[in-house]
Amino acid sequence: MSMNDPISDMLTRIRNAQMVGKDSVRMPASKMKKRIADILKEEGYIESISESVDEANHTTLELTLKYYQNKPVIEEIKRISTPGRRTYVGKAEIPSVYQGLGIAILSTSKGVISSRRALELGVGGELLCTVY
């Protein structure tokens, strides 16, 4: 089965795993998903990331989820730009997620970066998702 939006699939897997209290979540890997996972780890939303290759030579990402007082650290993870409706923002239009408590993840000319890093670099790009 082909997947139309792998990033939405990744975010949904994380959301569903946290709703049922799973320790980790596995998903097919890609460079974009790996970079998004790296940003989530850098910002403290997930515990760790591991990559593995199975017998069929398919790469899999495993994210260890993070909880605080038995509640998921990620309260909301939301896809903004979709394949059918791309959303682009300039450097002045980068949103402040929950008054700066959350982050947005953008795909820019400098790579996939967090909204904080995009503001430092002064670049805009495609608004992939928001995390709070």
Curated annotation (Swiss-Prot):
Gene Ontology molecular function terms on file: rRNA binding; structural constituent of ribosome
Pfam families, alphabetized: Ribosomal_S8
Top-level taxonomic group: Bacteria
GO biological process: translation
Cellular component, GO annotation: ribonucleoprotein complex; ribosome
Keyword entries, A-Z: Ribonucleoprotein, Ribosomal protein, RNA-binding, rRNA-binding
Record-stated family: Belongs to the universal ribosomal protein uS8 family.
Protein role: One of the primary rRNA binding proteins, it binds directly to 16S rRNA central domain where it helps coordinate assembly of the platform of the 30S subunit.
PANTHER family, alphabetized: 40S RIBOSOMAL PROTEIN S15A (PTHR11758)
Subunit structure: Part of the 30S ribosomal subunit. Contacts proteins S5 and S12.
Listed name of the protein: Small ribosomal subunit protein uS8
Organism: Magnetococcus marinus (strain ATCC BAA-1437 / JCM 17883 / MC-1)
Gene behind this protein: rpsH
